[in-house]
A protein has these predicted regions:
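Trp- and acidic/polar-enriched beta-sheet ligand-binding modules for extracellular glycan
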Residues: 190-195, 217-284, 305-308, 317, ...
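Short surface loop/edge beta-strand patches of beta-sandwich-type extracellular domains
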Residues: 200, 310-312
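Short intrinsically disordered coil segments
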Residues: 124-128, 185, 243-244, 289-298, ...
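Positions in alpha-helical segments
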Residues: 135, 308-309
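Mature catalytic domains of secreted/periplasmic carbohydrate-active enzymes
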Residues: 1-233, 238-254, 264-276, 280-284, ...
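Extended extracellular/luminal ectodomain segments enriched in beta-structured repeat modules
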Residues: 203-210, 258, 315-324, 379-381
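Predominantly extracellular/luminal regions of secreted and cell-surface proteins
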Residues: 100, 284-305
């Protein structure tokens, strides 16, 4: 179960009216009809990591002090501990000392294979690349999280061929990697304590750039910090380190030729139960660099006339079909635009508002380019964007975050 804004909060419709959900009715219906279904976010099975870009976190505990929202005591408990679903610390020893109960509440990382969560034919060429999907995999599943990859059906109820082809490539790439584990006896069970280490032999002539560690989570999650080293012709070389391991932790690093791996558990809680150490070679992938397909009017001819609201002289009169807001570096910032009004002018003095939806939907959690199509040809030399942040303060938008599509 997943609310429209991924947070479980009362989402707002285009008219700004809050949509109120009867969560208790949802819970009871799910538990009655499908008791084994995973109830995410507002349920108590998995929690949201805090973004919709497919990025997990360096430190991720499955056993957390966070009380799931399904329980009536959640608000009181979480307020007392000063935690919330996206809090950086949900399971450190310091937090455990304050808590009176723990919940097995693993992290879910969600992302769409396309720019948005729903199908649009004009995005058929914008399906995430194999490299992008692979990076997401290693930064979600490889960070002790569950990956929810959204694959939206088209208007016929089918998965588009572009999505299917990419998924097949993605599956084949992972199968190729994990078919060849270079560690000998990597499944020998290791009961580790703080300060202990274990050495594993590799197959002869091994070249590796990926290490996978796993804890036996049926006995809990215990590792707090670790280091991985490889024995090369020049001696032991550190290839990776981290904090938590959990069900699965994967480390990527430049290719090394090695004969052995050494895993050091620097800190853990009592005894950590390591049930697999593996090493692989992942063939490097190159990203296909594409131009800004959301802007076809060179910015070299633009001039920023004002900062707030952002006002731009396009340098000449053009016919606009759409404009796009693309948050810098695809990062969600407190100053980013959420609600907006878009104006055009021929002289920079007399302005006309272009009718539009007025909201960059869900951009706080999925800060990717959002295009607003006008539905009519709009003449303009000057454009102006009046925008407010998700907290209703004045937004700060740079000229490089705006694109326009012109039409004859």
């Amino acid at each position: 179960m997943k609310s429209e804004d991924s947070t479980g909060r009362m989402a707002k419709g285009p008219n700004g009216k809050k949509q109120v959900y009867d969560w208790d009715a949802f819970y009871k219906t799910i538990q009655r009809l499908q008791p084994k279904a995973v109830m995410a976010i507002m349920g108590d099975d998995v929690r949201w990591v805090g973004n919709e870009r497919g990025l997990g976190r360096e430190t991720e505990w499955n056993a957390t002090v966070l009380t799931p929202g399904i329980y009536a005591r959640s608000t009181e408990n979480n307020k007392r501990l000063g935690v919330f679903s996206k809090a950086e610390d949900l399971g450190s020893r310091k937090m455990l000392e304050k808590a009176t109960e723990l919940f097995w509440y693993p992290s879910e990382v969600d992302v769409s294979i396309r720019p948005g969560w729903f199908y649009h034919a004009e995005e058929d060429a914008k399906v995430k690349s194999l490299k992008h999907l692979s990076d997401i995999y290693f930064q979600s599943v490889g960070y002790n999280s569950v990956l929810l990859l959204n694959i939206p059906p088209d208007r016929k109820g089918l998965i588009n061929e572009a999505d299917v082809n990419r998924l097949e490539e993605f599956a084949a790439y992972r199968e190729q990697i994990f078919a060849d584990n270079r560690v000998k006896k990597g499944r020998n069970y290791w009961n580790a304590i703080s300060g202990s280490e274990a050495v594993y032999s590799l197959e002869p002539g091994s070249e590796i750039n990926l290490v996978m560690l796993q804890e036996d989570i049926t006995k809990g999650q215990r590792v707090e910090s670790f280091v991985v080293e490889a024995l090369t012709d020049n001696g032991w070389k550190e290839v990776g380190k981290g904090t938590t391991i959990g069900y699965k932790r994967m480390l990527r690093f430049p290719v090394v030729k090695a004969s052995q791996l050494r895993v050091k558990i620097d800190e853990c809680r009592l005894t950590a139960h390591i049930n697999q150490v593996a090493a692989y070679y992942a063939a490097p992938l190159q990203e296909v660099v594409q131009g800004e397909d959301w802007n076809n009017l060179p910015r070299a001819g633009w001039k920023q006339v004002a900062d707030s609201p952002l006002t731009i002289d396009l340098g000449k009169s053009v016919t606009l079909a759409s404009f796009t807001y693309a948050p810098s570096k695809a990062e969600a910032k407190p100053t980013m635009a959420f609600r907006y009004k878009f104006f055009v002018s021929m002289d920079g003095k007399h302005w006309k508002e272009v009718p539009a939806n007025g909201e960059f939907s869900n951009i706080m959690h999925n800060p990717l380019p959002q295009t607003v199509t006008f539905g009519q040809k709009v003449q303009a030399r000057y454009i102006k964007l009046e925008a407010t942040t998700p907290t209703a303060t004045t937004a700060k938008v740079g000229m490089d975050e705006i694109g326009v599509i012109t039409t004859p």
